[in-house]
Regions:
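Short beta-strand-to-turn element immediately C-terminal to the catalytic PLP-Schiff-base lysine
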Residues: 40, 66-70, 88-91, 116-118, ...
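Flexible, small-/acidic-enriched active-site or ligand-binding loops
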Residues: 34, 92-121
Length: 287
């Protein structure tokens, strides 16, 4: 364990290496338990076969955490079920390749690619954590990731509002600044209030995660889901309203609002869709 930490963490933390997380598959998006990628023992190696899609950083990453099926067992009701494990895969491992880069609507500066495993052989000590507990590891990773995406959404919304406030002060129609019109003022006020509400949810989730990192036996799945759900929706709504206040200029690339609007949408999709966040929240309520 410590040898792996010494090998990977310094380079990842310094930025010399970039990492990526491989969970999503062509047939396993929201249904993350529907994994098809497999890892089979072969002497001192694991042999991986399958593919992953929509993997952030994949085009440039040096090391990947990959979730793959290692065991098939019967659950308490006698139904067949899959157990997944987590593995460390290096870019240079035989049988591993990075597929096509996605041509995305937004976050175009972020590399998003397919991962392909064709009899990819990795040393046995590259299993991460406990065998059969990869799904739990993935879900814990997503809890933290959702706070990060909520923060991203919050930043997009705040940036869009700042750009819009500056624009409406300068833009003149009917002989005066459009910031003088009540409609503009009410739009700005509502956007500001919604952003601040989202901010408190994001900070509350981050605080709960910090408590867990400091040793407290607390979970933050619901807080992370709430923060992501509201912050992502806020980002999409705020950028749409901001573009409307920009008018035709907002629809051009002379101003950043159109990019912010495109970037906002992905926050409602990755690290779990908004619908998944509602499943997490309602599941806790009805438990």
């Amino acid at each position: 364990m410590y040898k792996r930490q010494e090998k990977y963490l310094p380079k990842l933390c310094s930025g010399e290496w970039l990492g990526a997380f491989g969970l999503t598959e062509p047939g396993a998006g929201t249904d993350a338990q529907g994994q098809q990628t497999t890892a089979v023992e072969d002497g001192d190696y694991w042999v991986l076969n399958g593919s992953k899609i929509f993997i952030t950083n994949a085009g440039y990453a040096d090391v990947f955490i990959v979730i793959a099926v290692t065991d098939k067992v019967l659950d308490k009701k006698g139904r067949p079920t899959k157990l997944c494990s987590a593995f460390i895969v290096e870019r240079t491992d035989p049988g591993f390749s990075v597929g096509k880069a996605e041509d995305k609507m937004g976050i175009r500066g972020s590399s998003t690619c397919e991962l392909i495993f064709e009899d990819c052989r990795i040393p046995k000590d590259r299993m991460l954590g406990v065998r059969g507990k990869g799904f739990q590891l993935a879900m814990a990773t997503l809890d933290g990731g959702r706070i990060g995406i909520a923060s991203q959404a919050l930043g997009i919304a705040e940036g869009a509002l700042q750009e819009t406030v500056a624009y409406v002060k300068e833009r003149k129609q009917f002989g005066r600044s459009i910031s003088a019109f009540q409609n503009t003022q009410f739009e700005l006020a509502e956007m500001k209030a919604r952003i601040e509400a989202a901010k408190y949810l994001v900070y509350a989730a981050a605080l709960k995660k910090q408590e867990a990192m400091n040793g407290a036996k607390v979970r933050y799945s619901v807080e992370a889901a709430q923060a992501k759900l509201i912050a992502a929706r806020t980002a999409s709504d705020v950028t749409r309203r901001c573009l409307q206040l920009f008018g035709g200029y907002g629809y051009t690339r002379d101003y950043p609002i159109e990019r912010m609007m495109r970037d906002a949408k992905i926050t409602e999709i990755y690290e779990g869709t908004s619908e998944v966040q509602m499943m997490v929240i309602s599941g806790a309520l009805l438990k």
